């Protein structure tokens, strides 16, 4: 196989990668080792993590939203096999759209130490073998045809053909690998793997979350995607003590999991990237500013070198003026300013395309300009739509924030790509079915949904009919626009260029090699984009 000099090849044995920089002198060695041939006036609902934790009786926190439609037309968008993210690049955040990845789904008997349904069903159904629709936590039903049957479990929810709805588990390595293969096929760069601090002190919970992290690492290395860790410190039971636990967990992951040694772990300015969500929110119980300041200082300059990071804070949407969802203590301004990166949570902060335009002008552009003056990387949130009917026990409408066939998300992508001070975007979230922000493959047609319960398909908005992989394809197009491979354009993409087939993993053991080889096509020579006033090559 022909290999570009800018690419690393990765072999994985028990999650311990062997890496070779591919150069003229090492291609043969690589082949031998790896066997390779003003603010918006609009009604918005924002829930806190504690509210969701109590609602769902689960460990993790969620933060969410609402909204309303405009008009659009959506036909197919073509994807292409993604090029491996160059592991030698120490500025891997440049010109990237990176997805949040929950990886929080499970079922009894899947091998996870928690041994129950997680995030598909609320208690009491979370503890039964065949749960029913009354305790659903999700509005979207993922497609099931590409997962191994052993990686799914039947529920008690009926399909129209008399079978039962099946659900996958993130504990299964091939499930996570499949998701990363979809990213690879559609040119999506990678993920922030979210690690919830709630419940992490419990051995079984910590092992479950570490199991998923291992799955994501392995999948990233096999597919050439990149990944980094995102800690979530939200949750009704969490206090300021969580900051000490977070530091201890990071040390453990660096020392025992060698997490930052992965060639696909995202690095910026020569440092591993770490994201901490929940800083400064009114709805989050972490309020001791001295402890927060101390933790940030430790990560940036006081920790032993192997634990230091490029630190991104997941912060409230009104962080800059300390109002609304942000704590008002002036000390938080200094905390925000001390971060390497600022990622405001924007899900639900607008509910129409026009209200997004207003929010973008009045808040996001001003946020990004402020960050540019401080030398802080600014990562706005992009999201496709929203619905949490089942999570809220029917008290919120189904399809609360319509997707408009993708036009709602594309408008955000266009505006972000056109903004001179925006160079990295957080896409919420790759696999989020609880609040229906998922971009991975979900049921496209209402007729194909389970017949029990209330569900949301991609054709819910009248006049829109898109395939199950539509948002994967749309994200890939947005990435190409963002890194300069196609022009920045407001026009919604409607062409369908030829798309490479999805690469399927082996159905054998989790540690076996995939049955297909990495794509060998050379990428188009990248253009350059402004990064905080400094021209930087595409990562």
Where are these regions (language model features)?
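Glycan-processing catalytic domains of CAZymes
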Residues: 61, 66-496
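Intrinsically disordered, low-complexity, compositionally biased regions/tails
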Residues: 15, 65, 75, 86, ...
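Low-complexity, Pro/Ser/Thr-rich intrinsically disordered segments
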Residues: 24-27, 494-539
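Residue-identity detector for glycine
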Residues: 11, 61, 532-533
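Cleavable N-terminal signal peptides of Sec/SRP-targeted secreted and luminal proteins
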Residues: 2-21
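Compositionally biased, low-complexity intrinsically disordered regions
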Residues: 8, 39-42, 533
């Amino acid at each position: 196989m022909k290999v570009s000099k800018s690419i690393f090849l990765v072999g994985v044995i028990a999650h311990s990668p062997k890496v070779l920089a591919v150069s003229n002198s090492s291609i043969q060695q690589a082949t031998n080792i790896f066997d390779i041939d003003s603010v918006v006036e609009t009604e918005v609902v924002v829930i806190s993590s504690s509210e969701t934790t109590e609602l769902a009786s689960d460990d993790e926190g969620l933060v969410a939203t609402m909204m309303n439609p405009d008009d659009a037309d959506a036909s197919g968008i073509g994807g292409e096999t993604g090029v491996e993210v160059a592991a030698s690049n120490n500025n891997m955040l440049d010109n990237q759209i990176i997805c949040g990845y929950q990886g929080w789904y499970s079922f009894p008997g899947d091998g996870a130490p928690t041994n129950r349904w997680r995030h598909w069903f609320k208690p009491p159904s979370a503890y039964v073998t065949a749960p029913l629709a009354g305790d659903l936590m999700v509005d979207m039903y993922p497609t099931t045809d590409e997962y191994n049957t052993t990686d799914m479990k039947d529920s008690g929810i009926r399909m129209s053909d008399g079978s039962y709805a099946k659900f996958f588990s993130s504990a299964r390595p091939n499930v996570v690998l499949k998701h990363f293969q979809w990213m690879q096929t559609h040119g999506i760069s990678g993920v922030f793997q979210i690690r919830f601090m709630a419940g992490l002190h419990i051995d079984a919970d910590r092992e479950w979350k570490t199991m998923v992290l291992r799955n994501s690492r392995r999948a990233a290395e096999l597919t050439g995607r990149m990944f980094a860790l995102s800690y979530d410190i939200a949750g009704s039971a969490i206090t300021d003590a969580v900051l000490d636990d977070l530091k201890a967990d990071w040390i453990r992951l660096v020392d025992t999991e060698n997490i930052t040694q992965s060639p696909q772990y995202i690095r910026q300015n020569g440092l591993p990237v770490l994201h901490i969500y929940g800083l400064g929110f009114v709805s989050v119980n972490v309020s001791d500013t001295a402890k927060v300041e101390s933790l940030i200082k430790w990560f940036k300059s006081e920790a032993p070198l192997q634990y230091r990071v490029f630190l991104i804070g997941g912060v409230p949407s009104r962080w800059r003026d300390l109002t609304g969802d942000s704590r008002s203590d002036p000390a938080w301004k200094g905390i925000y300013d001390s971060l390497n990166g600022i990622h405001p949570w924007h899900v639900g902060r607008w509910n129409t395309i026009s209200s997004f335009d207003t929010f973008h002008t009045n808040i996001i552009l001003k946020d990004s300009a402020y960050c540019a003056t401080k030398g802080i990387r600014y990562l706005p949130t992009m999201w496709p739509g929203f619905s949490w009917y089942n999570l809220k026990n029917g008290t919120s409408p189904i399809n609360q924030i319509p997707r408009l066939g993708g036009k709602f998300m594309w408008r955000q992508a266009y505006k972000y790509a056109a903004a001179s001070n925006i160079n990295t975007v957080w896409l919420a979230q790759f696999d989020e079915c609880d609040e229906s922000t998922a971009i991975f493959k979900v049921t496209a047609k209402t007729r194909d949904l389970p017949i029990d319960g209330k569900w949301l398909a991609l054709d819910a908005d009248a006049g829109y009919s898109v395939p199950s992989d539509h948002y994967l394809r749309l994200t890939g197009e947005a990435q190409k626009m963002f890194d300069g491979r196609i022009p920045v354009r407001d026009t919604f993409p409607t062409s369908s260029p030829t798309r490479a087939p999805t690469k399927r993993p082996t159905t054998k053991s989790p540690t076996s090699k995939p049955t297909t080889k990495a794509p060998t096509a050379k990428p188009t020579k990248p253009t350059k984009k402004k990064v905080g006033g400094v021209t930087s090559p595409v990562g």
